């Protein structure tokens, strides 16, 4: 019998940072990052676009779709508190294949605001209850991007629209009209 210590298997873990910090077994799927971005080019040069405008990740239930999407978010997400600081990103992705491509990491790691929504908590006994839960989810996601309100890249109309999306009561008011 071997005295080798084995890492625990992650069960019901759908958060990449949690998976990495709890020292569980992890299959490195970071090469997917480059694969997804391989077909994406700037909007200025549509002639180079090889892929689709839509990416569909299909897997059976409990096969890590949410974890994969969370890995994308963890890699791309800009820090609201300290834009440009990627030290947390480097810590999470230490030892993964993606860090071998410095040019790719410099271009994408920690550079984008990422809107990630999971609908697993948006349920209810009827449409109105489910809609209210969805409004809570959307407003919660929008709250993560409050720092963008100070960005000179948003005009007044975009900021007003963001304010509405961030307001849970505003979002819920649409269900009340039905």
Predicted region positions:
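Glycine- and acidic
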Residues: 14-22, 51-57, 119-120, 168-177
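P-loop NTPase motor core
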Residues: 28, 38, 58, 68, ...
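Mid-core helix/loop region of P-loop NTP-binding domains shared across ATPases and GTPases
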Residues: 145-178
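N-terminal pre-Walker A segment at the start of P-loop NTPase domains
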Residues: 4-41
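Conserved lysine of the Walker
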Residues: 65
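Pre-Walker A (Motif I) flank of P-loop NTPase domains
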Residues: 41-55, 112
